Amino acid sequence: MSGNTGERPFADIITSIRYWVIHSITIPSLFIAGWLFVSTGLAYDVFGSPRPNEYFTESRQEVPLITGRFNSLEQVDEFTRSF
């Protein structure tokens, strides 16, 4: 036999006007905030990932693949010097 936790049933919550008043504002706000975070380029700055125009430089147009097993550190250093 299960006990009562005292919480409202989920069906009561999602059918209440208060739920939809709150969430009709917060859900679009979160979407707009995420879109602005990505479209302004702040996401690239925060996470340190290169912007789409920085993947390939003028001096290096090939894909930076690590091909050697024993000289991988030198290859990584060579790739990072071009940034």
Swiss-Prot record:
The keyword Ribosomal protein does not apply. Its cofactor is heme b. InterPro entries: PSII_cyt_b559_asu, PSII_cyt_b559_asu_sf, PSII_cyt_b559_CS, PSII_cyt_b559_N, PSII_cytb559_asu_lum. SUPFAM superfamilies: Cytochrome b559 subunits. With its partner (PsbF) binds heme. PSII binds additional chlorophylls, carotenoids and specific lipids. It comes from the Eukaryota. Pfam families: Cytochrom_B559, Cytochrom_B559a. Heme binds at residue 23. Keywords: Chloroplast, Electron transport, Heme, Iron, Membrane, Metal-binding, Photosynthesis, Photosystem II, Plastid, Thylakoid, Transmembrane, Transmembrane helix, Transport. It is a single-pass membrane protein. One of its GO terms (molecular function) is electron transfer activity. The chain crosses the membrane at residues 21-35. Belongs to the PsbE/PsbF family. Heterodimer of an alpha subunit and a beta subunit. PSII is composed of 1 copy each of membrane proteins PsbA, PsbB, PsbC, PsbD, PsbE, PsbF, PsbH, PsbI, PsbJ, PsbK, PsbL, PsbM, PsbT, PsbX, PsbY, PsbZ, Psb30/Ycf12, at least 3 peripheral proteins of the oxygen-evolving complex and a large number of cofactors. It forms dimeric complexes. PANTHER family: CYTOCHROME B559 SUBUNIT BETA-RELATED. This is Cytochrome b559 subunit alpha. It comes from Physcomitrium patens.
